[in-house]
């Protein structure tokens, strides 16, 4: 990636997560995620499943961050190679948190009938959250794996290897 995505990714991982807070920003937000998920993880059905998945992702996000922090001192290419995948991974994980919160509120309004919107709106909100967890959130796994991949394959080509006669 080049341009905006690459720059924002380098800023997130390099400046904000690693240098600025030594991972504290991730620990703080994932603590919020866990607290929110805990309120629903024993629920039956999709809300409980989504809450448990969110809790797992919050813990995993901390582990991914810690693994990068431990390797970065020995591998100067790691921040550049991991940053875009780390950005994408973080985005998917954070959105899981917001989707499960929205779905839980929608379920409450469906049950008590006190929401300002129609029942169809709240059902659609829950269905959209289910779609996110089933179809989009699994993409985070590939980004996690790529962010943690060795940099050797990325950096092994020399400058001369890019010139063909």
Residue positions per predicted region:
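Generic recognition of well-ordered alpha-helical segments
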Residues: 9-13, 32, 95
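Active-site or pore-adjacent capping/gating segments
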Residues: 23, 28-35
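C-terminal amphipathic alpha-helical interaction region
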Residues: 16-20, 35-165
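Catalytic phosphate/nucleotide-handling subdomain of diverse soluble enzymes
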Residues: 1-20, 24-25
């Amino acid at each position: 990636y080049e341009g905006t995505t690459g720059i924002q990714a380098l800023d997130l991982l390099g400046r904000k997560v690693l240098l600025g807070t030594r991972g504290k920003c991730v620990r703080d937000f994932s603590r919020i995620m866990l607290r929110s998920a805990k309120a629903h993880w024993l629920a039956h059905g999709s809300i409980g499943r989504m809450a448990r998945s969110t809790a797992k992702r919050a813990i995993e996000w901390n582990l991914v961050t810690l693994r990068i922090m431990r390797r970065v001192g020995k591998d100067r290419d790691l921040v550049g190679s991991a940053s875009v995948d780390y950005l994408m991974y973080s985005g998917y994980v954070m959105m899981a948190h917001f989707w499960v919160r929205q779905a839980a509120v929608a379920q409450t309004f469906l049950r008590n009938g006190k929401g300002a919107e129609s029942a169809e709106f709240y059902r659609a909100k829950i269905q959209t959250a289910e779609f996110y967890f089933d179809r989009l959130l699994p993409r985070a796994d590939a980004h996690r794996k790529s962010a943690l991949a060795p940099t050797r394959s990325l950096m092994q080509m020399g400058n001369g290897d890019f010139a063909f006669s």
